[in-house]
């Protein structure tokens, strides 16, 4: 267990920590161990076979690498043609789409309704929130939303945006490891 969210705060548990009802737990595990864990707690696991990612930055690149290694079909929507070329060369198994990811008609035409994972990774928090809310309305897939600013995390928690990724937390966690 890496962290526990409780009552709007984040706790890094120690050996004496006790989980409470309503705690949101973040943990780190291999895919096999995570699957085993979810089976033990009788939580159904629905493997993802395809993902639609909006935003083609560094997080999208590394996430796509991981997904492709796990045989997940990846489509990345990126509006910058030069970045699309870089992604296409770096991730030849992924489908790179040069389009404005906030174009709702385009997202629907790309199969948003049938995607099993929708990931909003643009550099604009508000756009990510709106994209995720749109995806939530049109898809039963898993949702992941990147949020850069931490100031509104209590408000965002009430919006049911799926898994929220805070790059600042990820950087801190990475630095603390060493």
Predicted feature descriptions by range:
Residues 1-178:
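Cytosolic regulatory regions of ion transport systems
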């Amino acid at each position: 267990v890496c962290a526990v969210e409780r009552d709007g705060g984040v706790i890094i548990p120690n050996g004496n920590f006790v989980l409470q009802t309503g705690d949101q737990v973040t943990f780190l595990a291999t895919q096999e161990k995570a699957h085993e864990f979810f089976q033990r707690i009788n939580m159904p696991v629905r493997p993802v076979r395809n993902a639609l990612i909006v935003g083609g930055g560094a997080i999208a690149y590394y996430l796509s690498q991981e997904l492709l290694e796990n045989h997940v079909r990846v489509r990345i929507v990126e509006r910058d043609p030069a970045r699309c070329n870089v992604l296409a060369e770096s991730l030849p198994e992924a489908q790179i789409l040069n389009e404005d990811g906030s174009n709702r008609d385009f997202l629907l035409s790309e199969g948003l309704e049938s995607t099993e994972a929708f990931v909003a990774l643009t550099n604009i928090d508000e756009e990510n929130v709106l994209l995720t809310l749109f995806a939530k309305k049109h898809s039963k897939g898993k949702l992941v939303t990147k949020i850069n600013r931490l100031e509104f995390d209590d408000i965002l928690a009430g919006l049911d945006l799926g898994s929220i990724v805070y790059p600042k937390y990820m950087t801190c966690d990475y630095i603390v490891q060493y």
